[in-house]
């Protein structure tokens, strides 16, 4: 058992493979686990295990995702790989599988293809900041100049979408050769180089407890003679008794209040942190000043907004979504954290309508402000059922 305990002491990072169909994402994922398993750092998965990924339901959307885990000397990784292109699109937009960084797989024999571009664009929209490139199938390219050309193309493509194309690590190799010869030092060198690049280039993510305090309010009640209690699950940061916080959302104004008590499982605490379900006792707040759908947050860390741009995946009929397209000016409900707010949608210029199964950029104007930042996920609902899933990519006002 001692070993299992040691695993947890390594920093944890979530990554995934992205890139065009048949460029070797799944083969690379299998090769990483097989090569590292040989060094005692993973359980080996073969191609078929990963390829027949189970269907998962995330907010009613069907996504096929394979999860594998492995370690390097320095870190523990959770790695996602999706069999189909549509699965990637859904995964990235819904945030079903969080990625702190990604390995972009490009076939050296083919160069960047349409989905290579699309995955880079989506990654930049949904907040993946770090990409490491694996130029795969290098054994199929005889001319070293051709390899250099493909590498240049990939770097230019990354720069086009605001990634630091010149600085991104690019590793060249053959995932299949490594998978077939996991003990041959020469065959596995590219895999080891890739893991070293991932280790050093993709930073350890900031832990939720290090971020500014934020708690979406789920319920509010009054304790006679003591004040108003707001309950919810702390999403980020740490809260101490005596801290001043702001109530944000549903009104233009923010209201500052002091937390005079924190209760969890009927016990009083001095502090609460990310992941805790708590009741926060607030001084000098009327029951009518605060409601579900607002958030408690560290002063000036988050602001209420009504206009934003979102990247949205529209559910297919088979996923319980709409059976028909919607048009410019469509007014559904937008579900943020704990509440629905009506908003109107403006489609990109030249776009007449959106079909179920599409993913698009849309401009949204809500009728009441919501505490939001870029990267916040939301659902689009109509009569209580989810018809779309999205992420805020830009705050307008």
Swiss-Prot record:
InterPro entries: EF-Tu_GTP-bd, EF-Tu_GTPase, EFTu-like_2, EFTU_2, G_TR_CS, P-loop_NTPase, Small_GTP-bd, T_Tr_GTP-bd_dom. Residues 174-176 are annotated as: G5. It catalyses: GTP + H2O = GDP + phosphate + H(+). Residues 81-84 are annotated as: G3. Keywords: Cytoplasm, Elongation factor, GTP-binding, Hydrolase, Magnesium, Metal-binding, Nucleotide-binding, Protein biosynthesis. GTP hydrolase that promotes the GTP-dependent binding of aminoacyl-tRNA to the A-site of ribosomes during protein biosynthesis. NCBIfam families: EF-Tu, PRK00049.1, PRK12735.1, PRK12736.1, small_GTP. This is Elongation factor Tu.
């Amino acid at each position: 058992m001692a070993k299992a305990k040691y695993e947890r002491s390594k920093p944890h990072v979530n990554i995934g493979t992205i890139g065009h169909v048949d460029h070797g994402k799944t083969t690379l994922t299998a090769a990483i686990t097989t090569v590292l398993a040989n060094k005692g750092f993973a359980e080996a998965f073969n191609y078929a295990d990963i390829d027949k990924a189970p269907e998962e339901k995330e907010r009613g959307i069907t996504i096929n995702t394979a999860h594998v885990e492995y370690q390097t000397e320095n870190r523990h990784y959770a790695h996602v790989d999706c069999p189909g292109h549509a699965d990637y699109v859904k995964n990235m937009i819904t945030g079903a599988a969080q990625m702190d960084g990604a390995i972009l797989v490009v076939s050296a024999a083919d160069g960047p293809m349409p989905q290579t571009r699309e995955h880079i664009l989506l990654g930049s929209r949904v907040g993946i900041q770090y990409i490491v490139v694996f130029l795969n199938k290098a054994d199929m390219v005889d001319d070293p100049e051709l390899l250099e050309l493909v590498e240049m193309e990939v770097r230019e493509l990354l720069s086009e979408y605001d990634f630091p194309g010149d600085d991104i690590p690019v590793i060249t190799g053959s995932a299949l050769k490594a998978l077939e010869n996991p003990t041959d030092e020469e065959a596995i060198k590219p895999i080891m180089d890739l893991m070293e690049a991932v280790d050093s280039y993709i930073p350890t993510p900031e832990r939720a407890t290090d971020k500014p305090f934020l708690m979406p309010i789920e319920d509010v009640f009054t304790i006679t003679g003591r004040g108003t209690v707001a309950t919810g699950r702390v999403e980020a940061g740490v809260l101490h008794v005596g801290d001043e916080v702001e109530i944000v959302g549903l009104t233009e104004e923010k209201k500052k209040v002091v937390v005079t008590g924190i209760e969890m499982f009927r016990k009083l605490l001095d502090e609460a942190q990310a992941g805790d379900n708590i009741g926060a006792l607030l001084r000098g707040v009327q029951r009518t000043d605060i409601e579900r759908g607002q958030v408690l947050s560290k002063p000036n860390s988050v602001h209420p907004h009504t206009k934003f741009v979102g990247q949205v995946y529209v559910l297919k009929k088979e996923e319980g979504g709409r059976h028909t397209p919607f048009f410019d000016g469509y007014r559904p409900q937008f579900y943020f954290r704990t509440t629905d707010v009506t908003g109107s949608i403006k489609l990109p210029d030249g776009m007449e309508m959106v079909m179920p199964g599409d993913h698009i950029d849309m401009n949204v104007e809500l009728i009441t402000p919501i505490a939001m930042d870029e990267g916040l996920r939301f659902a689009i609902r109509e009569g209580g059922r989810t018809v779309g899933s999205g992420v805020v990519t830009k705050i307008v006002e």
